[in-house]
């Protein structure tokens, strides 16, 4: 198996062993990362390699926003335990690191390690912090978003430091951008709580929507079986799950269906124009459940659950005198995608007593 530079880099970062030692171990293990860790340990290169068993999946998410809301940075720095995450020194480390990343315009962990903080190479500074705090610490990821003179960015990190969000908006004017900063922060708070994965239904892949629609219908049908058994009202089974599935032709057909219903009900044609928009809105609400779950603009606003973020955004644009469009969205949740290590206490004691 070909041993790539990326594989060597990952093994080196997880074990702290030398680059050539990592390359040799990977070659001997035929590319198997865990076997390579074991080989390093067996060869006496494993003091640092033992760090790989000390999974850093706790820690903090940190957010730094510049004074004029033109630049914002989010980072996740992991520790092994929640106890250390509450340590003031670790909290200061995350804050200082995030501010440093933003100030220097750093875009990668490699660039971060080579940078200088307080007159010391960051890699050395960070190792000193690990030694002082006494746990394996990892700068897992970070991202910075920026705005021009007509844009605005803002951020929010939940008080427990486990969730952080950045949102960037393009505005019609610099004046609108300045006025919109607090509103954008409120949207960040919404996203922290409601967990949208993308900005708009337009960002959802077609295959993903179709797959999720099948799962959604199965979920609702299963729930309906229980509701029917209990004699309760059943869920409506939607015809669609996302606005991405509702073409202009489909919408025209729905409007014709509504007109036929109104005609059958004997409603005068002169009032149809007042009724149809509300029914169309209801149709969208019933048939965009996936958007409501996964897209920022499609979700109902936590501060006004009668309106979607898209509707609130339109109202705020009108209020501030210029269009506001969400163009950037980043959400970090602590440890997402990491497997947390579950310690076997009995096995640990047995190992220590031989």
Curated annotation (Swiss-Prot):
It comes from the Bacteria. GO terms for molecular function: translation elongation factor activity. Gene3D superfamilies: 1.10.286.20, DNA helicase RuvA subunit, C-terminal domain, Elongation factor Ts, dimerisation domain. The keyword Protein biosynthesis applies. Keywords: Cytoplasm, Elongation factor, Protein biosynthesis. Pfam families: EF_TS (PF00889). InterPro entries: EF-Ts_dimer_sf, Transl_elong_EFTs/EF1B, Transl_elong_EFTs/EF1B_dimer, Transl_elong_Ts_CS, UBA-like_sf. GO terms for cellular component: cytoplasm. It is found in: Cytoplasm. The keyword Methyltransferase does not apply. Belongs to the EF-Ts family. Associates with the EF-Tu.GDP complex and induces the exchange of GDP to GTP. It remains bound to the aminoacyl-tRNA.EF-Tu.GTP complex up to the GTP hydrolysis stage on the ribosome. This is Elongation factor Ts. It comes from Campylobacter curvus (strain 525.92).
């Amino acid at each position: 198996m070909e041993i790539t530079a990326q594989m060597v880099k990952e093994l080196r970062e997880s074990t702290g062993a030398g680059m050539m030692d990592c390359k040799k171990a990977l070659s001997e293990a035929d590319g198997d990362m865990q076997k390579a860790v074991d080989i390093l340990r067996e060869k006496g290169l494993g003091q640092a390699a033992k760090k790989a068993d000390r999974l850093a999946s706790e820690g903090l998410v940190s957010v730094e926003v510049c004074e004029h809301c033109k630049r914002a940075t989010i980072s996740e720095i992991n520790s092994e335990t929640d106890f250390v995450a509450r340590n003031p020194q670790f909290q200061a480390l995350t804050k200082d690191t995030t501010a440093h990343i933003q100030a220097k315009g750093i875009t990668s962990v490699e660039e971060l390690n080579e940078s200088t903080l307080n007159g010391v190479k960051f890699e050395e500074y960070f190792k000193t912090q690990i030694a002082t705090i006494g746990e394996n610490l990892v700068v897992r990821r970070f991202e910075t978003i920026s705005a021009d003179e007509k844009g605005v960015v803002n951020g929010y990190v939940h008080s427990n430091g486990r969730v952080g969000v950045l949102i960037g908006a393009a505005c019609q004017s610099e004046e609108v951008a300045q006025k919109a900063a607090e509103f954008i922060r409120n949207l960040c708070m919404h996203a922290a709580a409601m967990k949208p994965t993308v900005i708009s239904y337009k960002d959802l892949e077609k295959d993903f929507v179709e797959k999720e629609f099948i799962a959604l219908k199965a979920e609702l049908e299963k729930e309906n079986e229980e509701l029917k058994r209990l004699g309760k009202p059943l869920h409506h089974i939607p015809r669609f799950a996302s606005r991405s599935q509702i073409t202009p032709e489909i919408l025209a057909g729905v409007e014709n269906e509504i007109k036929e219903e109104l005609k059958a009900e004997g409603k005068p044609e002169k009032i149809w124009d007042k009724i149809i928009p509300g029914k169309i809105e209801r149709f969208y609400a019933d048939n965009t459940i996936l958007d409501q779950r996964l897209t920022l603009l499609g979700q109902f606003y936590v501060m006004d659950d009668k309106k979607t973020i898209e509707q609130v955004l339109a109202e705020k644009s009108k209020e501030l005198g210029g269009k506001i469009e969400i163009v950037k969205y980043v959400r970090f949740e602590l440890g997402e995608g990491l497997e947390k290590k579950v310690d076997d206490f009995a096995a640990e004691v047995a190992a220590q007593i031989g």
